[in-house]
């Protein structure tokens, strides 16, 4: 559904705050919201995507934020962090100024994550903590946005139980924030503006990037994989690729501004370009084009093994500014569990992909994601995950207990692995993760590595910290002037998840950019 169609069919619905908790909200959801539905969602076709390059904030909204401040609390993935940069850009264009003091902020937005129950619980706790602030300062605006806003159960819970919230908007209509804010200021009711269908791809949105060293670059939106445990295809919508020329222009501008590293973002970056109907162009082609731009480091995330092509492997193997680090979520090492998860690959095909990657990129660092305690996972099936970890020798992994998400196919399965069993398995897995991380780190002792210095260490302000091209954290002492620069560091000590070293020298740009 594009912007014109949406305007023609939109229905303005406001939820009255002073109604009783028993109020029936079904009419609201009938008109503007559809709860997650796998059967219906999978029917979504390859509709034409419209690209809006003429976005601009209406003059009548400029100045709305003069002498007002804002604060955004962000939960979740890199995509959410990037959305926060866009939201901040729009707010500053309206005249608002950022603040870090939640007690004085005039607009407080909570950008939410729906991937796990724990993340949602943190958000509800945060909203609850703001109730006293709303009583003390009734003129402030409190908003909830992000992936949780796309869930019916969440919106319903906020409407019924959190009257301190002034506005709710989702992942598809961030560019309508000026109108949402205006309505929130003028209305005595909670403003709910959630789109269940994707809109146009909006280019040239203002952004306030976090720092001037590393930058996120969105290359696509949404996901069509429908893994049975995942809510993302519902909260982020169908896959929509940005045009390559728009992405390349953005990366060139970041290079001109002096950024040292970019990360190409998407729920499944390996699907990039599949929906571009007029050209054959994939992530490998995009990486090739970006490799010619004078920016020292280029990363991409997140990858799905099913879509990882030999073309991509070949491009990464050529080196240059494409880093030799690939995050390749496996989730489980057992075929039966992978099938129930809807991952579309097998243990054998995953290991074959790993072999092809290692053959072409011998110095590659592989990391992964793993879910423990999926419904019906037996001890033997879990042990196959452990043996797969041994076979691959991942340098790091992000590990999680299975978290049931309403609206997903997995939510209909009986969560029949006891919590104590899940925790015990996670502990065993994490022990293995630490073991292989230590092995990977130990290889750096005595070596000199190139580090992108990002700032002071979180533990010691007198120590600087940064990351290698393989995403290894390095702590070292050096002049503060090195922040934002590529430097050489000799590694003196390898810890399990970080490295300590001694500053050698600054790296000249021509030594890095090829």
Curated annotation (Swiss-Prot):
It catalyses: N(6)-dimethylallyladenosine(37) in tRNA + (sulfur carrier)-SH + AH2 + 2 S-adenosyl-L-methionine = 2-methylsulfanyl-N(6)-dimethylallyladenosine(37) in tRNA + (sulfur carrier)-H + 5'-deoxyadenosine + L-methionine + A + S-adenosyl-L-homocysteine + 2 H(+). The keyword Transferase applies. PROSITE patterns: MTTASE_N, MTTASE_RADICAL, RADICAL_SAM, TRAM. Residues 209-440 form the Radical SAM core domain. [4Fe-4S] cluster 1 binds at residues 77, 113, 147. Its cofactor is [4Fe-4S] cluster. Pfam families: Radical_SAM (PF04055), TRAM (PF01938), UPF0004 (PF00919). Binds 2 [4Fe-4S] clusters. One cluster is coordinated with 3 cysteines and an exchangeable S-adenosyl-L-methionine. Keywords: 4Fe-4S, Cytoplasm, Iron, Iron-sulfur, Metal-binding, S-adenosyl-L-methionine, Transferase, tRNA processing. Residues 1-21 are annotated as: Disordered. [4Fe-4S] cluster 2 binds at residues 223, 227, 230. The keyword 4Fe-4S applies. CDD domains: Radical_SAM. Residues 442-505 form the TRAM domain. GO terms for cellular component: cytosol. Its EC number is 2.8.4.3. It comes from the Bacteria. It is found in: Cytoplasm. It is an enzyme of class 2 (transferase). GO terms for molecular function: 4 iron, 4 sulfur cluster binding; metal ion binding; N6-isopentenyladenosine methylthiotransferase activity. Catalyzes the methylthiolation of N6-(dimethylallyl)adenosine (i(6)A), leading to the formation of 2-methylthio-N6-(dimethylallyl)adenosine (ms(2)i(6)A) at position 37 in tRNAs that read codons beginning with uridine. Belongs to the methylthiotransferase family. MiaB subfamily. PANTHER family: CDK5 REGULATORY SUBUNIT-ASSOCIATED PROTEIN 1, MITOCHONDRIAL TRNA METHYLTHIOTRANSFERASE CDK5RAP1. Monomer. HAMAP family: tRNA_metthiotr_MiaB (MF_01864). This is tRNA-2-methylthio-N(6)-dimethylallyladenosine synthase.
